[in-house]
Design a protein with these regions (language model features):
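C-terminal outer-membrane beta-barrel translocator/porin domains of Gram-negative envelope proteins
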Residues: 1-86, 96-113, 181-182, 187-191
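Outer-membrane beta-barrel strand-turn architecture
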Residues: 5-9, 86-90, 137-140, 176-178
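Outer-envelope beta-barrel architecture signal
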Residues: 9-15, 76, 90-94, 139-143, ...
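Residues that define the transmembrane beta-barrel architecture of outer-membrane proteins
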Residues: 40-42, 74-78, 124-130, 137-139, ...
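Strand-loop-strand
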Residues: 110-138, 151
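Outer-membrane beta-barrel "beta-signal"
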Residues: 134-143, 163-191
Length: 191
């Protein structure tokens, strides 16, 4: 579902909501790979690397020491975004955006703990990110660049100095553009 609000000739608000549920039937245990859902990346949650979010509270990076091939898939998808688009100069356009969403599993998976969908907790597992983008609109194609960072991760993060208080929380107090470590761990550039 997409909806656009034209504020005036040069400014608009674009919204999008994407949902999906898939279920393997017959003698299949899992949906075909191509039919499974993923979130994260340039056409999804832009503050997270491609296909890196979820399912649920599962955190691939906490268990694996590689970011070479993160490919998280799920049976349920909920994703939305809102973007304020504006003209900067002729073919150059800008956008400020907020993206939110996650994927979940229908069945428990021992290899991906925390991935099963539950009505009483799914809203706590929604990842949220924000950022700024530039668009170069040449009529016959659009070249797009986005820089984004997470405001809320889908998994609990440590909020204490001693490393023992894992909680779902907003990350406003952690934002520090002057820290090279924060930039390395949080800024995501999409093209």
């Amino acid at each position: 579902f997409r909806y656009y609000f034209d504020l005036n000739k040069r400014n608009k608000i674009a919204t999008r909501l994407t949902t999906g549920v898939g279920y393997a039937y017959g003698n299949s245990q899992f949906m075909p790979y191509i039919k499974q859902f993923s979130v994260g990346g340039s056409n999804s949650l832009r503050a997270f690397p491609a296909r890196s979010v979820g399912p649920g509270t599962y955190n691939f990076l906490a268990i694996n020491d590689t970011t070479f091939f993160i490919d998280q898939r799920g049976d349920i998808k909920l994703e939305g975004n809102i973007e304020y688009r504006f003209d900067i100069y002729k073919a150059v356009k800008g956008g400020l955006f907020v993206d939110a969403g996650n994927i979940w599993l229908i069945k428990n998976d021992t290899l991906r703990p925390g991935g099963k969908f539950a009505f009483n907790s799914f809203y706590k597992q929604v990842a949220v990110g924000t950022g700024f983008g530039l668009r170069f609109d040449f009529s016959f194609f659009v070249l797009r660049f986005d820089l984004a960072f997470p405001l809320r991760k889908a998994y609990p993060v440590d909020g204490s100095e001693d490393g023992t208080n894992n909680e779902f929380r907003w990350a406003f107090r952690d934002i520090d553009f002057t820290s090279k470590y924060w930039r390395r761990d949080n800024l995501v550039f999409n093209r």
